[in-house]
Amino acid sequence: MADTTPNGPQGAGAVQFMMTNKLDTAMWLSRLFTVYCSALFVLPLLGLHEAASFYQRALLANALTSALRLHQRLPHFQLSRAFLAQALLEDSCHYLLYSLIFVNSYPVTMSIFPVLLFSLLHAATYTKKVLDAKGSNSLPLLRSFLDKLSTNQQNILKFIACNEIFLMPATVFMLFSGQGSLLQPFIYYRFLTLRYSSRRNPYCRNLFNELRIVVEHIIMKPSCPLFVRRLCLQSIAFISRLAPTVA
């Protein structure tokens, strides 16, 4: 009987595996759609006007995925402060907020990369499970691509964190250029503090520390002008005060 367990990839078949894990399959499909829409925004093969609509579709699909994942993590919804506090600890809640921040804003390529890459990584993980359910030797070329993605996962997560950080000044620039709303930088700052405090994904916090070390190393060189050094040190102190306390 152990060989016929529904969740077991061996012998169950890909379709049976996906039907057994319906919520995971729904998120997999929405992530694939997010990747598709994001790619058509980054590479506007159908024209610039269509690219803007694909930008919105990608963020809406990501919002759906994030909502499904949040429901999976916290299935029993409660209208209480305790539930909200618990939800704000979840990465899926962070990216639900992220999607809502940018879905109606001016399309920015930098803002689509975290959505695209997170969807790609998570879709790749589930695709490997589907392939295992289909057979251990099925589609070797696709498996090779998925293995390469897995090998470069840390670099991809660092790149995502870099985008998350530099979108903060980008939202301020968009505000002064007339392409953003007054509330967007403040809401995005809240998102960034949530990413900084993330328990499951420390890359944003680690990258902040790495950037601070690099900047301090550069400005402490004798060739660095004094006013630049002071400006950088004041900026570092200001950003450090804004950073949330991490347990």
Curated annotation (Swiss-Prot):
Name assigned to this protein: Transmembrane protein 33
Compartments in which it is found: Endoplasmic reticulum membrane; Melanosome; Nucleus envelope
InterPro entries recorded: PER33/POM33_regulator, TMEM33/Pom33
Gene: Tmem33
Similarity-based family: Belongs to the PER33/POM33 family.
Role of this protein: Acts as a regulator of the tubular endoplasmic reticulum (ER) network by modulating intracellular calcium homeostasis. Mechanistically, stimulates PKD2 calcium-dependent activity. Suppresses the RTN3/4-induced formation of the ER tubules. Positively regulates PERK-mediated and IRE1-mediated unfolded protein response signaling. Plays an essential role in VEGF-mediated release of Ca(2+) from ER stores during angiogenesis. Also plays a role in the modulation of innate immune signaling through the cGAS-STING pathway by interacting with RNF26.
TM spans (from-to): 32-52, 101-121, 156-176
Keyword Endoplasmic reticulum: yes
UniProt note: phenotype after gene disruption: Deletion mice show renal protection against acute kidney injury (AKI).
Keyword Membrane among record annotations: yes
Residue ranges annotated as Cytoplasmic topological domain: 53-100, 177-247
GO cellular component: endoplasmic reticulum membrane; melanosome; nuclear envelope
Keywords associated with the record: Acetylation, Endoplasmic reticulum, Immunity, Innate immunity, Membrane, Nucleus, Transmembrane, Transmembrane helix
GO biological process: innate immune response; positive regulation of IRE1-mediated unfolded protein response; positive regulation of PERK-mediated unfolded protein response; regulation of endoplasmic reticulum tubular network organization; response to endoplasmic reticulum stress
Membrane topology (UniProt): Multi-pass membrane protein
Residue positions, PTM N-acetylalanine: A2
Assembly and interaction partners: Interacts with EIF2AK3. Interacts with RTN1, RTN2, RTN3, RTN4 and ARL6IP1. Interacts with RNF5. Interacts with RNF26. Interacts with PKD2.
Record topological domains on the Lumenal side: 2-31, 122-155
